[in-house]
Amino acid sequence: MSISWTRNFFERFCVEEYNIDTIKQSSFLSADLLPSLGARINQSTKLRKHIISPFNPRYRAWEMWLVLLVIYSAWICPFQFAFITYKKDAIFIIDNIVNGFFAIDIILTFFVAYLDSHSYLLVDSPKKIAIRYLSTWFAFDVCSTAPFQPLSLLFNYNGSELGFRILSMLRLWRLRRVSSLFARLEKDIRFNYFWIRCTKLISVTLFAIHCAGCFNYLIADRYPNPRKTWIGAVYPNFKEASLWNRYVTALYWSITTLTTTGYGDFHAENPREMLFDIFFMMFNLGLTAYLIGNMTNLVVHWTSRTRTFRDSVRAASEFASRNQLPHDIQDQMLSHICLKFKTEGLKQQETLNNLPKAIRSSIANYLFFPIVHNIYLFQGVSRNFLFQLVSDIDAEYFPPKEDIILQNEAPTDLYILVSGAVDFTVYVDGHDQFQGKAVIGETFGEVGVLYYRPQPFTVRTTELSQILRISRTSLMSAMHAHADDGRVIMNNLFMKLRGQQSIAIDDSNTSGHENRDFKSMGWEEWRDSRKDGYGLDVTNPTSDTALMDAIHKEDTEMVKKILKEQKIERAKVERSSSETAGRSYANDSSKKDPYCSSSNQIIKPCKREEKRVTIHMMSESKNGKLILLPSSIEELLRLASEKFGGCNFTKITNADNAEIDDLDVIWDGDHLYFSSN
């Protein structure tokens, strides 16, 4: 089991998210390759023969192996520089094996494609790869891999030549690989950013302590008078001590100096050590500022959500106390803030808003379509209607005992209960009366939204609930764009309301609180009543209150009386307009009743668009006459007969000689030709 876990752990480092053969990405954050503008997204990137992709998993594994060798080199270089003389031992063999791996990497680099910094495309030309490598890091890589230890033994048998030791320190150049690794891991969302940064900061601190201790010991070891050194003053025969004791003592001095503790047991004794301590303390100032700044930033970022939450709770509590709000409202405020804090990572509405509309629609369709599809209100509607509707759905969480809808509130949204439960209550005589309950999969608020009536109930959650919210604007737009689906929705609502005995509605236009039977007026009446004109506009809460009340009470006589008065006013307006225009047909058309009755005892306006047409006699090539199109074919034939001297016309054709027998096919501005059979 441990072997499998270890393999999976290293695969997270080695496997790159970018698949070069299929251009398939699971995460684009750590991949630097971008397609050029206009490039086909499904076009595979094929490199030349013997050229290796830098995103190849095997090459990533090779880089990870080199990083482990770099960690070894970072520790052994300062340690050998200060404590160990070069000789043919186990460390000598290991160092040369490590150098061999880095020599192989130098050769391998000539066959690895690189990412162009200007075009962000992979360059696989061997010539360009070689020129780029030779002009950048090749010389440093060679110097950091050169076998200076064997050369030191060749020219200096005791292996203590300082020059070769300094040259061996060039192996620290390999640390750039560790820096690149941390830079890549910080952008990789598969790893925790906080712990990656902490690991990097701890590694920098340990390396600084290790190097400072080794360098300070080297100064004491090379000083002519061992007793006048920082370690010789305490241990006069320190050179005879074990390697472990000397190394631990050096680290002790380094870390006490780095942390500015300074116990005083080890301190500089000669000018060389004093000079080194001066530069080391100056370095410590910058390193300490770097560590404190980064750790502070990480901790602040980690605790910012909690701090914001506490500030919000404190502000809400102070606001409630200052304004002496009731305890139930205070509890709702605090519950809402607490729930928002807990579900902040679940909703992520800000993330969705930053995505393109097509992606948001796909996400909404995947999450909400199965839920909306099973709602009674949308049974029988088309898939296109639901797809348009779910794109504008918002999911929200509500804590227990929070009001979602208030009684007599203006209708704004339709709600679908996904989880939890809500109660319906009506405020009567100073008390809330329980009217019903909604469970998972049910809707509420549809009556107020579809009829633009004040909300009949107060809807309050009884437990933690997830609710989908559909705005009235989105629903109305979808219903008008899909008229057949709108008719189905209104019929579904009508069937539900007809099956209920009574629905309590508090009418704000009348006094008292009564329970009334609320019936649907039907889709056709609802749709026509929304048109501009002199009819009832149910979308305007301030329009014709008496007529709305009459329809709501199903008082047919009152509806007829009110509409009769409106018809008289309408006729006066049309007659005045006709006389001013001087139209010959205006007097005839003003006699027509602009209102017609519907099949459900609800009278609605029959609004007719006026069209101007030019009429001609087929047998004469005289100028035509411009008239207003009447309401029937017979009226049009009669009017043409009057205009052309009493001719008995029986046939109407258009400019293309096509016979016309229906006024609906005539457009404004058409030329009509009359003839007799």
Swiss-Prot record:
Domain (KHA) spans 612-677
List membrane-spanning regions: 64-84, 91-111, 135-155, 166-186, 201-221, 273-293
Span list, region Disordered: 568-601
List localization entries: Membrane
- Membrane association type: Multi-pass membrane protein
Q: Which GO terms describe its cellular component?
A: monoatomic ion channel complex; plasma membrane
What result follows from mutating residue 177 to Q?
Answer: Affects the voltage-dependent gating
Mapped to this chain, the residue ranges on the Extracellular side of the membrane are 85-90, 156-165, 222-248, 269-272
Domain remark from Swiss-Prot or TrEMBL: The segment S4 is probably the voltage-sensor and is characterized by a series of positively charged amino acids. The pore-forming region H5 is enclosed by the transmembrane segments S5 and S6 in the Shaker-type (1P/6TM) and contains the GYGD signature motif which seems to be involved in potassium selectivity.
Residues on Cytoplasmic side: 1-63, 112-134, 187-200, 294-677
Reported effect of changing residue 264 to C/F/K/L/P/S/T? Abolishes channel activity
Tell me yes or no: is Nucleus among this UniProt entry's keywords: no
**Tissue expression summary:** Expressed in guard cells, and in roots.
Matches recorded under InterPro entries: cNMP-bd_dom (IPR000595), cNMP-bd_dom_sf (IPR018490), Ion_trans_dom (IPR005821), K_chnl_volt-dep_EAG/ELK/ERG (IPR003938), KAT/AKT (IPR045319), KHA_dom (IPR021789), RmlC-like_jellyroll (IPR014710)
Pfam families, per the entry: cNMP_binding, Ion_trans, KHA
Annotated protein name in UniProt: Potassium channel KAT1
